């Protein structure tokens, strides 16, 4: 109903502006302050004041005289407040919003018949997932969830870099060194076992005798050239290493969880000839030059050239990624890529090159994020230093378990929890805290992860909003068979109406957040919903209300709040516990 109400507001404003002879291109629709009961407000009078040669309140008054809620289904009344115009919902809006909230699928938008591929994570398969890069799968998974809720047909891809020097070094090291020469792995999982070879190989290349290094580099170059030439045996050798490491990385990412529909390998675009085709077309462009022993593409508005072919005839990552993106454009209507801030230049070069090759780059959107820091400073992936994502998740669960155990005496319900229940809740809360704390911030802003904030049950954190969902479930379980009734008349207090107004906003928040690829807007919504619900919970008894009609209506409101919170958390990839 929120989206339908907004359309009515847009229509009413456009008609009033047209009647007054004003342009209708910018309606100035916004969310009013929290102390205003309106759902929408318009600041359009500020924009028109200069042309009207009148102060904004006078312009607003002129428009208010033309605005009429009569005949509108969801706009109940319209009032001027100084330079602003406030739009208040009708009883029909509240009634239909409460009814819509009874569905477990509340918030899902109609199909847009548009396919979208969301590429995220795509960490090089060289070892465990590092916590500094954890923002990518968390944001990427949330963006994919968000677009799915918004009605898009979404595929989730992990682009596997299986063709660069790192993988050639890794393959050479795996085939060269004996496991007996390696230290014990940090964990008994594939990527932790395999990364020892990669580290050993890099250490050897840095410290070994120059002649030995030269021989090793020749072997590494042979692997690179074999990939470039389409040698099947080389693909199999590299593929064994890549697939083994990826199996372990998948297990780590599944803990978040972040799962994928397809792992698209870089070598696919070497083997099918599309990379060679890209090279030929790039060489034919006016900006293509051969200098510094490589083919490069110069841009009009980007200072740094794109190197797309080495002197030895081997392609580069970005060259293959161009072929990859053209494949995306042929397969999907839209493409979204989640990238770290250190890829900004590469992303700009890629977009410009795709455009020069005749592609419609309006199909492509990037979500750029800054990295995660711990309080002691920025973490590094070089030489295996820093904290792995597994370590962070383990500690999150341990800390959550301690917190849950200390709160067992304050639980809403008197049922007994066994150890398995405590462990389940600890995992839901702990991993949820990590995801929520990371996804709740604007991607472009750096994050310093702090446990006290992430696991604070009283502050606006994952446990805080998860607790609201658990509380809703507890109330509904205590209803003893009393059926909710989605009737608005008994819900006449400010706390009830404020909660319902907030519940009803979810579809609009999803639409706006999806348009901008900003899942943090959903996190903001969950905090507001939690605040409104807690006020309602304090002021409005549900199962103990004196009037049966009030009890049923409030139960319906609790059910709507539960569905709104559950689905908002689902978008964020945070579990919604039924008990805590």
From Swiss-Prot:
Segments carrying motif 'HIGH' region: 123-133
InterPro entries tied to this protein: Arg-tRNA-ligase (IPR001278), Arg-tRNA-synth_N (IPR005148), Arg-tRNA-synth_N_sf (IPR036695), ArgRS_core (IPR035684), DALR_anticod-bd (IPR008909), Rossmann-like_a/b/a_fold (IPR014729), tRNAsynth_Ia_anticodon-bd (IPR009080)
GO biological process: arginyl-tRNA aminoacylation
Record SMART domains: Arg_tRNA_synt_N, DALR_1
Catalytically driven reaction(s): tRNA(Arg) + L-arginine + ATP = L-arginyl-tRNA(Arg) + AMP + diphosphate
Domain of life: Archaea
Leader sequence segment: none
Protein name (database record): Arginine--tRNA ligase
Organism: Natronomonas pharaonis (strain ATCC 35678 / DSM 2160 / CIP 103997 / JCM 8858 / NBRC 14720 / NCIMB 2260 / Gabara)
């Amino acid at each position: 109903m929120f989206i339908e109400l907004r359309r009515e507001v847009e229509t009413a404003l456009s008609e009033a502006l047209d009647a007054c002879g004003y342009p209708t291109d910018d309606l100035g629709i916004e969310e009013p302050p929290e102390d205003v009961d309106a759902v929408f407000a318009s600041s359009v009078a500020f924009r028109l004041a200069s042309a009207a040669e009148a102060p904004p309140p006078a312009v607003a008054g002129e428009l208010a005289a033309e605005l009429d809620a009569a005949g509108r289904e969801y706009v109940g009344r319209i009032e001027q407040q100084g330079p602003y115009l406030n739009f208040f919902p009708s009883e029909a809006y509240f009634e239909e919003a409460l009814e819509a909230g009874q569905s477990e699928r509340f918030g899902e938008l109609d199909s847009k018949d548009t396919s979208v591929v969301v590429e995220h994570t795509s960490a090089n398969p060289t070892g465990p997932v590092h916590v500094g890069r954890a923002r990518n799968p968390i944001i990427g998974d949330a963006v994919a969830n968000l677009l799915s809720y918004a009605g898009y047909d979404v595929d989730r891809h992990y682009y596997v870099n299986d063709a660069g020097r790192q993988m050639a070094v890794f393959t050479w090291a795996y085939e060269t060194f004996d496991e007996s020469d390696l230290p014990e792995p940090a964990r008994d999982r594939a990527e932790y076992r395999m990364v020892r070879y990669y580290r050993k190989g890099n250490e050897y290349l840095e410290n070994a005798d120059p002649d030995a290094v030269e021989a090793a580099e020749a072997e590494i170059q042979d692997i690179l050239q074999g990939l470039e030439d389409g040698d099947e045996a080389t693909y199999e050798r590299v593929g064994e290493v890549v697939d083994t490491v990826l199996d372990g990385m998948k297990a780590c990412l599944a803990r978040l969880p972040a799962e994928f529909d397809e792992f698209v390998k870089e070598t696919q675009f070497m083997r099918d000839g599309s990379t060679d085709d890209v090279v030929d077309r790039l060489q034919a462009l006016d900006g293509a030059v051969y200098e510094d022993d490589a083919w490069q593409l110069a841009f009009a508005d980007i200072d740094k050239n794109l190197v797309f072919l080495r002197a030895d005839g081997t392609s580069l990552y970005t060259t293959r990624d161009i072929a990859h993106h053209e494949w995306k454009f042929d397969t999907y209507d839209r493409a979204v890529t989640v990238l770290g801030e250190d890829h900004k230049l590469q992303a700009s070069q890629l977009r410009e090159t795709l455009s020069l090759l005749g592609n419609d780059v309006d199909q492509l959107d990037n979500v750029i994020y800054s990295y995660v820091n711990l309080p002691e400073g920025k973490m590094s992936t070089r030489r295996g230093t820093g904290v792995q994502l597994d370590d962070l998740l383990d500690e999150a669960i341990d800390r959550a378990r301690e917190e849950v155990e200390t709160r067992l005496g304050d639980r809403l319900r008197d049922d007994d929890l066994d150890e398995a229940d405590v462990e389940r809740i600890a995992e839901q809360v702990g991993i949820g805290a990590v995801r929520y704390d990371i996804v709740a911030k604007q991607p472009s802003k750096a994050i310093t992860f702090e446990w006290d904030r992430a696991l604070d049950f009283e502050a606006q954190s994952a446990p805080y909003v998860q607790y609201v969902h658990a509380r809703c479930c507890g109330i509904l379980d205590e209803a003893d068979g009393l059926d909710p009734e989605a009737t608005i008349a008994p819900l006449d207090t400010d706390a009830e109406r404020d909660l319902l107004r907030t519940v009803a906003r979810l579809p609009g928040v999803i639409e706006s957040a999806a348009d901008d690829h900003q899942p943090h807007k959903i996190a903001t919504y969950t905090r507001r919903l939690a605040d409104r619900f807690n006020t309602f919970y304090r002021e409005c008894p549900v199962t103990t209300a004196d009037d049966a009609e009030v009890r049923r209506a409030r139960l319906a409101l609790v059910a709507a709040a539960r569905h709104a919170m559950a689905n908002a958390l689902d978008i964020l990839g945070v579990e919604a516990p039924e008990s805590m």
